[in-house]
Amino acid sequence: MRILGIDPGLRVTGFGVIDQSGHQLTYVTSGVIKTADADLPTRLGTIFEGISTLIRQHAPDHSAIEKVFVNVNPQSTLLLGQARGAAICGLVSGGVPVAEYTALQLKQAVVGYGRATKEQMQQMVVRLLCLSGIPSTDAADALGMAICHAHGGGTLSTLGGIAPGLAKKGLRVRRGRLVG
């Protein structure tokens, strides 16, 4: 099963594609869709087209996107919601089922701790997907979304083959931190 994870943003939308076969997760690609410093409709169109292009290139079976949270600034929340809407429209128009997860669910599924930092997310994504480099925070969050969906949005303790895989490498999660 191929999963496209999306971390929506008006300026930068992260994406990550993974393949899942049983408990095995394989990295396919990741990156960001950057919007030009233009008017809102142009930015939303760029996000929509970027998602549509990813669907044509990678043919995902499923997708996962972060739910909108209420920010301190209501205007920022509205803009984020519009960027998320453009991404969802791209997914739906491409025939890709969409699952939604909160930031808490994402962090619990990937790191095992709901208040994990961006750096902890990046470290765990690198470990779980055996990446040679550290992805940007937006791409790491998108890959994390895909990982979260691959494991039903569950916590690290229910990830089946992932936790034993970390143990074989001498790694574990303690108080939300990856330790060796």
From Swiss-Prot:
Reactions listed under catalytic activity: Endonucleolytic cleavage at a junction such as a reciprocal single-stranded crossover between two homologous DNA duplexes (Holliday junction)
Broadest EC class assigned to this enzyme: hydrolase
UniProt keyword Nuclease, yes or no: yes
Intracellular or extracellular location(s): Cytoplasm
Keywords annotated in UniProt: Cytoplasm, DNA damage, DNA recombination, DNA repair, DNA-binding, Endonuclease, Hydrolase, Magnesium, Metal-binding, Nuclease
Membrane-crossing segments per the record: none
Active-site residues, record numbering mapped to chain: 7, 66, 138
Annotated Mg(2+) 2 binding sites: 66
Cofactor: binding details: Binds 2 Mg(2+) ion per subunit.
Gene Ontology biological-process annotations: DNA recombination; DNA repair
Cofactor(s), names only, from the UniProt record: Mg(2+)
InterPro entries tied to this protein: RNaseH-like_sf (IPR012337), RNaseH_sf (IPR036397), X-over_junc_endoDNase_Mg_BS (IPR020563), X-over_junc_endoDNase_RuvC (IPR002176)
Function: The RuvA-RuvB-RuvC complex processes Holliday junction (HJ) DNA during genetic recombination and DNA repair. Endonuclease that resolves HJ intermediates. Cleaves cruciform DNA by making single-stranded nicks across the HJ at symmetrical positions within the homologous arms, yielding a 5'-phosphate and a 3'-hydroxyl group; requires a central core of homology in the junction. The consensus cleavage sequence is 5'-(A/T)TT(C/G)-3'. Cleavage occurs on the 3'-side of the TT dinucleotide at the point of strand exchange.
Assembly, per entry: Homodimer which binds Holliday junction (HJ) DNA. The HJ becomes 2-fold symmetrical on binding to RuvC with unstacked arms; it has a different conformation from HJ DNA in complex with RuvA. In the full resolvosome a probable DNA-RuvA(4)-RuvB(12)-RuvC(2) complex forms which resolves the HJ.
Protein name (database record): Crossover junction endodeoxyribonuclease RuvC
Organism classification: Bacteria, Pseudomonadati, Pseudomonadota, Betaproteobacteria, Burkholderiales
